[in-house]
């Protein structure tokens, strides 16, 4: 489940034979993935991650009341300046509410000025809690490389209007950039 307001993630339990609301088992400001359950057991394994937290493997009871982290991948990044991710919102030039993600350098100081890179392609705010491996890409930038070198990276959602890709992009992107400059 993906709450629209926070972009957090969770697992829920539901009985389709009743009209009762699903019961939350685990939810929060992270991304849960890869849940597996073996036959004849009351345990699952799954991964939990965020932009700052490596997608470690967890072992839990079916009700998620007892959970153990099995791996500690975050140890490999302890010697690096690791940035943070923040969800932001603004209004486009054509009046639509938009969201995006701002990736800030480690030890971000709001009183200080930083260079900013704008990286965009359609809608990516849903990736707020995705862990990104620091590696070169051929079609996007390495957020960690730029964060560790003192850059802010802004990834705004773009809502395209059919037949008007350039104007749509401008209408979405420019107010988002102006909002960040004004902060």
Protein language model annotation of sequence segments:
Residues 5:
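Alpha-helix-centered segments that form part of catalytic cores
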Residues 11, 31-32:
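Generic preference for hydrophobic/aromatic residues in regular secondary structure cores
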Residues 11-26, 60-68:
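Surface-exposed loop/turn elements that mediate protein-protein interactions on large endomembrane-trafficking
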Residues 33-183:
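Serine-hydrolase catalytic core recognition
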Residues 8, 29, 82-84:
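Residues that act as N-cap/strand-start positions at coil-to-secondary-structure junctions
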């Amino acid at each position: 489940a993906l709450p629209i307001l926070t972009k957090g993630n969770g697992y829920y339990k539901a009985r389709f034979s009743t009209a009762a609301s699903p019961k939350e088992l685990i939810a929060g400001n992270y991304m849960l993935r890869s849940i597996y359950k073996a036959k004849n057991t009351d345990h699952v394994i799954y991964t939990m991650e965020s932009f700052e937290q490596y997608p470690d493997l967890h072992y839990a009871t079916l009700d998620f009341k007892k959970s153990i982290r099995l791996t500690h991948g975050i140890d490999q990044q302890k010697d690096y300046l690791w940035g943070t991710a923040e969800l932001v919102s603004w209004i486009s030039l054509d009046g639509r509410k938009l969201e995006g993600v701002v990736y800030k350098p480690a030890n971000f100081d709001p009183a200080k000025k930083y260079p900013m890179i704008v990286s965009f392609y359609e809608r990516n705010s849903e990736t707020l809690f995705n862990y990104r491996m620091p590696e070169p890409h051929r079609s996007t930038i390495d957020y960690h490389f730029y964060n560790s070198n003192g850059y802010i990276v802004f990834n705004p959602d773009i809502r395209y209007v059919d037949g008007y890709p350039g104007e749509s992009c401008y209408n979405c992107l420019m107010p988002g950039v102006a909002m960040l400059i004004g902060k």
